[in-house]
Amino acid sequence: KEYNNGKIIGEWVSLPCEGLEEVLHKISNNGNDELFISDYETDISNLKISEYDDILQLNEIAEEIDNLSDDEVIALQAYLEQYNDIEQALEEVRQGNYTIYYDCDDMSDVAYQVVNESGLLDGVPETIKGYFDYEAYGRDIDIEGTFIQVDNNIIELY
């Protein structure tokens, strides 16, 4: 009602917010006016918030995100690129359905880590190891899986 009459009442709120219900009650004219989100900022890449998202639900999601480890935040960003659905992305993170390959610029870096961690070339003489094609192996594992780059990390999603 107030909005339609040209009177906009709003307040910047950082989530999670303990007193959110009080703030919402105040800016909604004691619950008589519709609330909407006109702007937002987030450090979580690929997190999309729409104008009429449930602010109380967003507050709960923000609390959960605040409790995530750095690795879980990296995985969350990858899942958001894959699904664009925060609830589904958080569920996948909770289940731990990912592997993070750190400091990777491309899939050849991932291939190098996979080969070294798996011991794939253990027992192969050093003079022959130099001929291994990490770029080609990286292309092959990229085709076989789902890999998302977040900053300088590549995350494999299962």
Where do the PLM segments sit?
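N-terminal ordered "arm"
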Residues: 1-32
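Structured domain cores in non-transmembrane regions
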Residues: 20-84
